[in-house]
A protein has these predicted regions:
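A short glycine-rich, aromatic-capped structural motif
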Residues: 43-119, 132-133, 137-140, 144-278, ...
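Functional-site microenvironments in short loops/helix caps that host divalent-cation chemistry
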Residues: 24-31, 53-54, 60, 65, ...
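Sec-dependent N-terminal signal peptides
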Residues: 7-14
Length: 444
């Protein structure tokens, strides 16, 4: 699927400075009238589970080998990126199943609180400990019934559907929608969106129009009267801070039919029926996940972490997809190699491949695999990251465009475009990196 990342906090980065910067002892006691800085507790950033710290650095971004077919010069650019945390492996079926199960169980608990299914209000929290009303949300401390009554059983049954032909009873994946909200800090910080017109420019030669109408674009999603999901991009005059809060409703179940639809005239029914559902594939990378689903997973993962850390935690850097520059910087390793490994060959001295890809025309098994492989069976790169080439391609947050690296900044570069529902398909394309098990060497 992809790897998530967490940005290193600025303070944690400052704590690691050494070498050319030397060391400086903080003053214990300041003299009267002197600026000595505020005191504070030392901070050590804990390592997020399953993630590797990638220190800040420089890379030449872009293809090292020029286009051999057309002889066109491929752009390269020197860029610098700040430090961040990155998952050491691709997201597995097991990890993504946890997300799907969370969505399923939240829907079930909400339904058990519905009068149509017994109306047990203890499955929802509607007020705080002081008795003040809050936005209704699921009470996860309330266990699901082990011996459901008739109404509760109907709630359970409502999440499943039966194939009228085969009689198979399966989860109704169409119901597995996850709703989340993301505050756009970047848009909110832009001067052109300041609520006070006087703050929109520092140029005193510019005459401020206090009646200027500033338009803002935001995403929203809701259920209509028929229970259908409606997704819209709204353009309206800026009115307040809520204009920077975007709402999404995303169906989270992966497209298991990709095994059939992406491979014409191939016998892949086994993977269609088993790859995501069978525990034997738990440690394999999840596939069939859209860019929207990948972002929803990151949002859920952030929310899940916050709930696990408890109410004393006010803020953490949220999980997100890496930018294309961050991904490439991490994949190249500490020595910024052409490949995630240390040489230009695809096999080691013993003839073993460094990654899971398509070694030869029609020959998928030459590297020991037919389809995807379990994560982390190949050696990691020098950053401690597995499968940065091959196995499955990975989503980034960066827009795919022909301008590519030339259009990016040389400082924490990326290209972002929040495509509206009605935008043409070409504006919705995102960059994927790393190649996959079905791609030739040139794609990795």
């Amino acid at each position: 699927m992809k790897k998530s990342i967490l940005l290193l906090s600025a303070f944690a980065i400052l704590l690691t400075l050494s070498g050319c910067f030397g060391a400086k002892q903080a003053s214990v006691a300041g003299r009267g009238g002197e600026v000595v800085g505020v005191s504070g507790r030392s901070f050590v950033e804990p390592a997020p589970y399953g993630m590797v710290k990638i220190n800040r650095g420089f890379l030449k971004m872009g293809m090292e080998t020029q286009d051999s077919l057309w002889g066109m010069k491929t752009p390269r650019k020197g860029v610098s990126v700040d430090g961040f945390w990155m998952d050491d492996t691709e997201i597995t079926n097991s990890e993504y199943k946890q997300f799907v199960a969370y969505v399923r169980d939240s829907i079930l608990r909400t339904r058990l609180a519905d009068p149509a299914y017994g109306g047990d209000e203890t499955y929802m929290i509607t007020e705080d400990k002081n008795g003040d009303p809050v936005t209704p949300h699921v009470n996860w401390k309330k266990a699901l019934p082990k011996k459901p009554n008739e109404d509760e059983q109907r709630a359970f049954e409502s999440l499943y559907e039966t194939n009228p032909v085969t009689g198979e009873k399966l989860i109704d994946w169409r119901q597995l929608n996850y709703k989340y909200e993301i505050y756009d800090y970047t848009a909110a910080a832009q001067r052109k969106f300041r609520l006070n017109p006087q703050e929109r420019t520092f140029n005193t030669d510019v005459k401020i129009n206090p009646d200027e109408v500033v338009m803002i674009s935001k995403d929203t999603a809701y259920y209509d009267d028929e229970g259908r999901v409606v997704r819209e991009t709204i353009n309206r005059p800026l009115s307040g801070p809520w204009d920077f809060l975007n709402t999404y409703i995303v169906n989270v179940y992966p497209d298991t039919t990709c095994w059939v639809n992406d491979f014409r005239n191939a016998e892949n029914e086994t993977y269609l029926r088993s790859y995501f559902s069978n525990p034997a594939y738990n440690d394999y990378p999840v596939v069939g996940v859209t860019w929207e689903q990948a972002n929803a997973f990151c949002a859920w993962r952030t929310d899940y972490l916050l709930k696990g850390l408890g109410p004393e935690v006010r803020y953490v850097q949220r999980y997100r997809l890496p930018t294309e520059a961050e991904w490439e910087y991490a994949a190249r390793g500490k020595n910024q190699n052409e490949f995630p490994w240390d040489n230009a060959d695809v096999k080691n001295g013993d003839g073993c491949f460094y990654a899971n890809f398509k070694p030869d025309r029609g020959n998928y098994t030459k590297d020991g695999n037919l389809i995807t492989s379990k994560v982390a069976i190949y050696s990691p790169n020098s950053n401690g990251l597995y499968d940065m080439a091959g196995n499955v391609a990975e989503w980034t947050s960066t827009v795919y465009t022909e301008a590519g690296v030339d259009a990016m900044s040389d400082f924490n570069p990326t290209l972002q475009y929040n495509a509206a529902i009605e935008d043409p398909y070409r504006l919705k394309k995102k960059s994927v990196r790393g190649g996959s098990w079905k791609d030739p060497e040139s794609f990795i």
